[in-house]
Amino acid sequence: MAEGIKAGFIGCGNMGGVLAGVAAKALGGDSVYVFDKHPEKTEKLSLNYGCNKAWAAEILEKCGIIVLGVKPQALPDLLEKIKEPLTRRTDRFTVVSMAAGVKTSAIEAALGEVPVIRIMPNTPCASGEGVILCSKGSFAGDEDLNAVLKMFEPAGKLLTVPESKIDAGCAVSGCGPAFVYMFIDALIDGGVRAGLTRAEATLLAEQTVLGSAKYAIQTGAEPAKLKADVCSPKGATIEGVAVLEEYSMRSAVMEAVKAAYERTVELGK
Ligand SMILES: NC(=O)c1ccc[n+]([C@@H]2O[C@H](COP(=O)([O-])OP(=O)(O)OC[C@H]3O[C@@H](n4cnc5c(N)ncnc54)[C@H](OP(=O)(O)O)[C@@H]3O)[C@@H](O)[C@H]2O)c1
């Protein structure tokens, strides 16, 4: 990464805010500039990570990496506003978009021949155990991609994929945290129903999901095999598994991913 690079974030809500924090860990807060319509959001980033509160104009003028963190519906309007200030730049800069479904070609059509990196992050990036999928636009080079990857290194796992796969990835890792939280929440309620306090059930449920994922990663074994390993004949676990099958848990999750994928594609139209 070019020494002394500055990164700017326009739109610092749930996801943009998390990624500004990640960038501050990698680059130092004094190299990160943040702007949002709601000043309280950037105030928090300034207090927590030492990021600089800035105006969009300042970010567009001096940041080498410009991250757009607004909702897909708000992106066309933002692109329209930033086009002119960006044409005045004579140095190299990279535009990063995290907007679900929006193709790099659409951003290039709005901004011209500028280097664009499209990413698909998730909120667990805040804990250092997130996932960010990355794809290069037509005018972005390896140097642009590498600078973005380096800046997001503290987020967790970073995967460069062809852009044709990013919407499917979004349905799994971008939307997946909500599905996993629903599962944890249900596991907690089940524990309370069986007699645990909510605090006890929460600790057990969260640690079980965390440990199961870690163990699957460590062993590299198929989750189906790991499930079979803990189901003893006529045991308690297989009884629970049978109920999940009866209530179509697996097909419900597969349908949820399909619906999220279809909606992601639709958001880009
Ligand atoms: N949340 C996730 O888990 C997740 C995961 C992967 C990708 N993403 C992507 O991340 C992007 C942001 O999602 P989010 O959930 O973080 O949304 P969010 O919480 O609503 O954050 C967006 C922020 O940007 C502000 N904003 C809108 N237009 C602006 C402008 N022109 N200048 C400055 N600030 C502006 C919004 O203000 P207003 O609310 O007043 O409009 C809001 O504070 C989306 O494109 C989404 O597809 C999100």
Write out the residue ranges for each language-model feature.
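NAD(P)-dependent Rossmann-like dehydrogenase/reductase catalytic/cofactor-binding core
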Residues: 2, 206-269
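Rossmann-like NAD(P)(H) cofactor-binding subdomain of soluble oxidoreductases
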Residues: 19, 40, 49, 58-134
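Hydrophobic/aromatic beta-strand patches that form the interior of the parallel beta-sheet core
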Residues: 33, 54, 96, 117-119, ...
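Internal alpha-helical scaffold of NAD(P)-dependent oxidoreductase catalytic cores
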Residues: 106, 110-115, 131-169, 180-218, ...
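Short pre-catalytic strand/loop immediately N-terminal to key active-site residues, enriched for Gly-Thr
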Residues: 116, 166-171, 223-228
